Amino acid sequence: VVDTRNNNIYVTWTQFDSYNSTTPGDSTIILFSKSVDAGESWSAPLRISKIAGTCLDGDNAVEGAVPAVGPNGEIYVSWAGANGLVFNTSSDEGVTWLTQETPIDPMPTGWDYDIPGLMRANGLPITLCDLSDGPNRGTIYVNWSDQRNGPDNTDVFMTRSTDGGVTWAPTSKINSDNTDKHQ
């Protein structure tokens, strides 16, 4: 994501010690890096996930981190893992982050699920921040999908925070059907 105030570029990703490893001690973590020169060079990767996941590419791995920028340059990142959907933030261009992830939603059935006819289905989060000049400026939105209502009922969910990610509104189901359908 690009911070349009200063043109900094922020990226986050999952690092696997050894992809699909079952070796104890191998883990996944979320890393952050930034460029202040249009991508010519990058800062050393910084770990922003305090709780690691497993290296098995599934619900217990930490994955899906995509940054968003707030109106004053805040960096917001959510991702999914064994502890559900979590959030971290930086208010100083990525130099420091919260000391522990903030829980958003338990994602009771995880982010990796089956949908007939698809090789793979993931309900990983997307994080956005309202940068408009309207009344919702600064509101952080996170949406994802999961199968909490049954294995044949994939639904789309959203939550929002109006205080920089300190607290989160109750999770809302977005799709309006009440049937066993995949969204």
Listing of model-derived features with the role each one plays in the protein:
Residues V1, D59-A68, I115-L128:
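Signature of short aromatic-glycine-proline-rich micro-motifs recurring in repeat-based ectodomains
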Residues V1-L31, A44-G64:
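Asp-box/WD-like beta-propeller blade repeats and closely related beta-sheet repeat scaffolds
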Residues R5-T12, N72-V77, D133-V142:
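Entry beta-strands of beta-propeller and related beta-repeat scaffolds
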Residues V11, F32, V77, F87, ...:
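Hydrophobic strand positions within the blades of repeat-based beta-sheet folds
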Residues Q15-D17, G81, W144-R148, S176:
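Transmembrane beta-strands of outer-membrane beta-barrel pores
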Residues N20-T28, A80-N83, R120, N149-T154:
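Short, solvent-exposed loop/turn segments at conserved positions within beta-propeller repeat blades
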Residues S33-C55, N83-I115, N149, T154-T179:
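Asp-box/BNR beta-propeller loop motif
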Residues R120-Q147:
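A conserved active-site cap/scaffold subdomain adjacent to cofactor or substrate pockets
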